[in-house]
Design a protein with these regions (language model features):
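Conserved FAD-binding subdomain of flavin-dependent enzymes
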Residues: 5-57, 72
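Flavin (FAD/FMN) cofactor-binding and adjacent substrate-gating region
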Residues: 46-133, 141, 145
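Flavin-dependent oxidoreductases
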Residues: 144-195
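N-terminal Rossmann-like FAD-binding beta1-loop-alpha1 element of flavoenzymes
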Residues: 1
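Short, well-ordered alpha-helix to beta-strand connector turns
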Residues: 15, 129, 156-157
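Residues that flank catalytic or metal-binding motifs in active/ligand-binding sites
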Residues: 15, 58-60, 181-184
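Short, glycine/charged-enriched secondary-structure capping and boundary segments
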Residues: 15-18, 34, 77-79, 173-177
């Protein structure tokens, strides 16, 4: 059973849904990229089939180099077999048309999940299986017993909290050394950039 209050500004609703296997600043692979990205593709491809919707897309991320050193580091990494699945340093005409940068650019093989398509489709699927409840979730209503957990008449063996930034306020998790962070929204409009 998924319990969700439909919070309009939850991270899932406003996130871009992007994945990027490379840390830009240090030009290193993201943690467990070699394991997690194949699992991401496999899982979302299966969900596309289940929901009969298209919502996972591969998309290259353009990295403009701030210096010759950054360009050299990128080209060296792109030639390294450990990074070859993620980095591309071949010229691309559609990028060349808009990227007027003296040190050049490289591309990172990333992508995104179209969350405005995925989230409502998955929500409807869960509703069709009687596995979704739109409701506030109050931790004080949780009761633990020998067979698992009970909440407002629903019983389960386990409970998974997916509270996002509200985890800090949780009576169960407030001891964790978490700090609030925030993302930024950036809307880009550029003539000739046909992505």
């Amino acid at each position: 059973m998924v319990i969700d209050n439909g919070y309009k500004t939850s991270a899932s609703r406003i996130a871009a849904g992007m994945w990027n296997p490379i840390l830009f600043k240090k030009l290193k692979k993201s943690w467990r990229a070699d394991d997690l990205l194949p699992a991401l593709h496999r899982t979302y491809t299966e969900l596309e089939e289940l929901l009969d919707k298209k919502f996972i897309y591969d998309r290259e991320i353009v990295r403009l180099f701030p210096s010759n050193d950054a360009a050299n580091d990128f080209h060296l990494a792109a030639g390294d077999e450990r990074y070859s699945d993620y980095l591309e340093d071949k010229p691309q005409p559609e990028v060349e048309a808009v990227a007027n940068d003296e040190f050049g650019y490289g591309t990172i093989k990333g992508g995104y999940v179209d969350l405005p398509v995925f989230l409502p489709a998955f929500r409807e699927y869960l509703k069709s299986k009687d596995s979704f409840l739109e409701s506030e979730f109050n931790e004080s209503d949780i009761q633990f017993n020998a067979s698992g957990v009970c909440w407002n008449g629903y019983e389960a063996q386990k409970i998974i909290f997916a509270n996002g930034f509200k985890t800090i306020e949780s009576a169960y998790w407030n001891y964790l050394p978490l700090t609030r962070t925030h993302g930024n929204l950036l809307h880009v409009q550029a003539e000739g950039l046909n992505l």
